[in-house]
Design a protein with these regions (language model features):
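P-loop NTPase catalytic core
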Residues: 1-165
């Protein structure tokens, strides 16, 4: 484990780069996530592991055969959300197509329901691999079914209703 906190967060300086070459994993802490009370405040777009390919077999055997595929789909949605969020910030949500709005809604679920933790809650402190797989499948099942419903003429507003609006 190597921990580096360079001045100004500039990880391009030599000590940080040497550490990254040795540990081959980077968890990018994000002040914006912390300000939004999203913990752990690890940025999923800047963080990486060079061990992912080596661990694929382990996850296939110990979590689910399709674990890496599920992970890849979630990461793709989060990356697309980042691109779409730039458009929303410039011209507003109304400029997005229904499928793009669905991507944003699904990504919100990934962030808030899957990646967000409350370390003080006994249930939320730790999640087993089995539960993680079920959560990933549930989020992606929602996305696939909602995409199908959109193709059949469903209203995006109804597909994106949060439970707080229903009760």
């Amino acid at each position: 484990i190597g921990a580096v906190s360079p001045p100004g967060g500039d990880i391009s300086e030599p000590v940080s780069q040497a550490t990254l070459r040795i540990v081959k994993v980077f968890w990018g802490l994000d002040a914006n996530l912390a300000y939004k009370r999203h913990f752990p405040a690890i940025n999923w777009l800047t963080s990486y592991s060079l061990y992912t390919d080596r661990l694929a077999d382990w996850f296939s055997k110990n979590a689910a055969p399709d674990f890496m595929e599920l992970r890849g789909k979630l990461m793709t949605l989060l990356q697309e959300e980042s691109e779409l969020q730039e458009i929303v910030n410039l011209v507003g949500m109304d400029a997005l197509s229904a499928p793009d709005r669905l991507k944003l809604e699904t990504s919100r679920s990934i962030r808030e329901d899957y990646l967000h933790q409350n370390a003080f809650d006994p249930t939320d402190t730790y999640t087993s691999l089995g539960k993680q797989v079920l959560m990933m499948r549930a989020i992606l099942a929602y996305y696939d079914k909602a995409k199908e419903a959109l193709a059949n003429g469903a209203d995006i507003e109804m597909l994106c209703l949060r439970s707080s609006y229903i009760f």
